[in-house]
Amino acid sequence: MAFSAPTFSLANLLNGSYGVDTPEEVERVRSEQREEAAAACRNYRPLPAVDVSESVTEDAHSLRTPDGAPSEEVSVEFVTYGAEDYLEKSDDELSVAFETMVKPMRIGQLWCPAFNKCSFISSIAMARALLLAPRTSHRTMKGFEDLVAAIYTKSDFYYDEECEADDIQIDVSSRDVPGYSFEPWSRTSGFEPPPICEACDMIMYQCPCFDFNALKKSCAERTFADDYVIEGLDGVVDNATLLSNLGPFLVPVKCQYEKCPTPTVAIPPSLNRATDRVDINLVQSICDSTLPTHSNYDDSFHQVFVESADYSIDLDHVRLRQSDLIAKIPDSGHMIPVLSTGSGHKRVGTTKEVLTAIKKRNADVPELGDSVNLSRLSKAVAERFFISYINGNSLASSNFVNVVSNFHDYMEKWKSSGLSYDDLPDLHAENLQFYDHMIKSDVKPVVSDTLNIDRPVPATITYHKKGITSQFSPLFTALFERFQRCLRERIILPVGKISSLEMAGFDVKNKHCLEIDLSKFDKSQGEFHLMIQEHILNGLGCPAPITKWWCDFHRFSYIRDRRAGVGMPISFQRRTGDAFTYFGNTIVTMAEFAWCYDTDQFEKLLFSGDDSLGFSVLPPVGDPSKFTTLFNMEAKVMEPAVPYICSKFLLSDEFGNTFSVPDPLREVQRLGTKKIPYSDNDEFLFAHFMSFVDRLKFLDRMTQSCIDQLSLFFELKYRKSGAEAALMLGAFKKYTANFQSYKELYYSDRRQCELINSFSCVELRIERSSSTKQRKKKDGIERRRSDKRRTPTGSYGGGEKTETKVSHEESTGTRSQKSQREGAFKSQIVPLPTILSGGWSGTDRAPPCEHGGIIRI
């Protein structure tokens, strides 16, 4: 029976069986070592006391130095104890000994190599064995660089007895394992020779080709991470590297693992580095070059133009009610962005705006499909769905769970909105065919260069009230969780508690991608899609009466926007805000994809709503025309295809793990959003900052390899410079560092007004003369009929003294009219200053502090 070659470990090396530990096996070997060390500690029996120090240090100077090693004396002061003695030491003592003997390199709070008790004690035992090997064996041991290479190549530690050591000069590089390099190394004084210019052969500091002062200034902000790509240390620093760092008693040999090939051409340093400090002007220049039509986009009055201009639209069966429109509630203002990224203002749901959105999102349903037998074909599509995606054994063994708990969670979530158990309606008494309608006030960022000719239309939401949704949502949530548990391993739905876009052990590089873009997805769905959903829901275990009930009030419905006074009937198409929207869109996309492509040819398949992405080793084969001719969808196969789904790029790190990165083009547009409400304590701005930080938590995983992937995918998808994407990452890194940096992106006119007034330490005092108007006295406080504010009474110069808090939002004309109605001032009137862009307005355009008194604003 053939046994596999033993892997390299210190234990196997001591007992004579040794092998190679590849980077992919490091984690497995280390776990085995930890288990062996734990077992050794449990079964440890102290050995008889032996004076090890005399046996080691007696002839320490007579030990032979391996060939090719430096001639410095080898110190053995740290190996006077055996491995058994180190087992009795505490972790703190071992940590101090590790730092003294190995001298690890510190990277922040990390050590390279990292401290491991088992590996450290085993290394000491091996070092002691290597020191005694020349005395215990008559054979000639190889030089240490050859010795380390022999460990990796599974060759002998000693030279052949028939040949002398001098006769065998083995080229170590010819026996290297790919990715490893072994070369003699000796400690130096730390002096580094000055760089030499390739152009004129002079020292770079004296070379006229380089401006040393500018170079010094550009490199002032450099850190360790700017020049060295810090990868995960686990798996890179192995036992052989740890042994080579035990310098006091081993011949120094540089043994390192190189993940990336060393560049053959040395590139002279550039004066403009990517690590230069990021400022607001750099970010704006990136926006101007990447989004040329966005930088000058200003839609402040676009909706005013729409409301005041002539309007013509062609819709059938529309009901308009103009008598009970809900007036717009004025807000407290919004923060103003410093960047101009093409972000629009909030949309108000007026009648014209709603009609425009309905025309684009709900009306003009395309008729692209052929005539088919709906009953027979819907069953066939549903059957193909289960064969392609569902694990039958898991579906048979799983059941509904957490339906009631999901209901209570939903009620608790919306408790603050006034939803209670007593207000739940009787669904049999409700007309479920009536849906409320609204438009989204936030418009999705536009990545195409069309803002100069096309005004984005807001998306619409068609929804039931919370009392109705609360009774359907728990059922579909539990059904979706069961659906996820029954999916095959290669199918990923990036939503919920048990799935995400993080894929461990899967590399997106060297794969063929397939991305299908489905346009007009919601309104293109018809009776065929509804029948497919009904068969799939019944197959997943949803009660048949509920499935039929749900599908019945989706066949013909009526939507109404109470605020805009617009209503119209619709049929079949997706309701964008009910309890089944995401789940229904996902299974429709999966069913259509399984009918057009053989899913067995893909290694991974990702679905989320109307988005889909597939990875295959060979170019995918299928018939995408069926999306149009059979399923009535406007489908487009994205070419060139890149790993992109849910507005995120998928990248792979050096360890073969895949993670998601939000689209930099969309994120840089969000930095200029105009939808952050103003607040005195910046609570809304801080909430946007925390959301921004959560979306960009991937930045800590971005190595140079990942940045190169992102630049390539960005360039392929948008036909724009990939270097701009790398610069955007630098901006994201700055503005996620702290909230103070993020606040540089926004300002407020109100905040500027308060900032100016904060330098004034005066208070405006207004004295009113006695008036003939009737007053009321209550609790000793005079109150004018026309003035609802209560003001304390007092005497000042024979008159009544009041302190009036004046809002800066009042206009000067309004204030003067009120003053005339209230009466003439007995004392000198101090004009209330008005803050303009050019300075102060009022008497002599002087700040209020020059008039004296007290002003409160």
Swiss-Prot record:
It comes from Cucumber mosaic virus (strain NT9). Pfam families: RdRP_2 (PF00978). PROSITE patterns: RDRP_SSRNA_POS. Interacts with replication protein 1a. InterPro entries: Bromoviridae_RdRp, DNA/RNA_pol_sf, RNA-dep_RNA_pol_alsuvir, RNA-dir_pol_PSvirus. Residues 511-624 form the RdRp catalytic domain. SUPFAM superfamilies: DNA/RNA polymerases (SSF56672). Its EC number is 2.7.7.48. The keyword RNA-binding does not apply. Belongs to the ssRNA positive-strand viruses RNA-directed RNA polymerase family. One of its GO terms (biological process) is DNA-templated transcription. CDD domains: Bromoviridae_RdRp. GO terms for molecular function: nucleotide binding; RNA binding; RNA-directed RNA polymerase activity. The keyword Nucleotidyltransferase applies. RNA-dependent RNA polymerase which replicates the viral genome composed of 3 RNA segments, RNA1, RNA2 and RNA3. Keywords: Nucleotide-binding, Nucleotidyltransferase, RNA-directed RNA polymerase, Transferase, Viral RNA replication. This is RNA-directed RNA polymerase 2a. It catalyses: RNA(n) + a ribonucleoside 5'-triphosphate = RNA(n+1) + diphosphate. Disulfide bonds: none annotated. Residues 772-857 are annotated as: Disordered. Residues 800-812 have a biased composition (Basic and acidic residues).
